[in-house]
């Protein structure tokens, strides 16, 4: 029975066609998560060659970031669509680590002016209480919201309904 269960469990495992992973530490080396992400990025890039996208905050705006290699060609049509239709300002390129996976850096600052509406929506839909938040809650929340919006914009523009997609926020 154990072999049968294992067979069916493995048989039903799905491999995603695309992976999106977001973290404050994508192209932004500030702590331990950076090491975890950058170490496994090479392995994931080998398996999913340019079908894994890391999403990070564009905290280096206007400054040279040695961890980010910007590209004008990667996802250029979607980048234009994201700005014009979804009001998302992104920079796209490669993470300067082994494997050089595709990176989307998003400017999350514009969402601060919509913060109260976003928090209201989160409370009404999911009962996420932001009233008692402290520390860097707002900054982390606005980045998380922006990263989710990136995937929400990218998916229908670039992928198909039959594509299996995983979104892993950190």
Task: Kindly label every feature range from the protein language model.
Residues 6-170:
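Catalytic cores of nucleotide-sugar-dependent glycosyltransferases that transfer UDP/GDP/TDP-activated
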């Amino acid at each position: 029975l154990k072999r049968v269960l294992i067979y069916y469990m493995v048989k039903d495992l799905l491999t995603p066609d695309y992976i999106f992973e977001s973290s404050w530490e994508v192209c932004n080396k500030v702590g331990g998560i950076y090491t975890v992400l950058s170490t496994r990025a090479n392995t994931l890039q080998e398996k999913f060659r340019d079908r894994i996208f890391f999403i990070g905050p564009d905290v280096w705006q206007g400054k040279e970031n040695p961890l980010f290699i910007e590209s004008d060609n990667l996802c250029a049509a979607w980048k234009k669509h994201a700005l014009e239709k979804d009001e998302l300002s992104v920079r796209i390129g490669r993470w300067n680590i082994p494997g050089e996976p595709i990176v989307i850096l998003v400017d999350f600052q514009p969402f601060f002016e919509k913060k109260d509406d976003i928090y209201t929506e989160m409370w009404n839909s999911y009962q996420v209480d932001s009233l008692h938040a402290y520390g860097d809650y707002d900054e982390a929340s606005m980045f998380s919201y922006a990263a989710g919006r990136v995937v929400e914009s990218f998916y229908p523009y670039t992928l198909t309904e039959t594509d299996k997609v995983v979104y892993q926020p950190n």
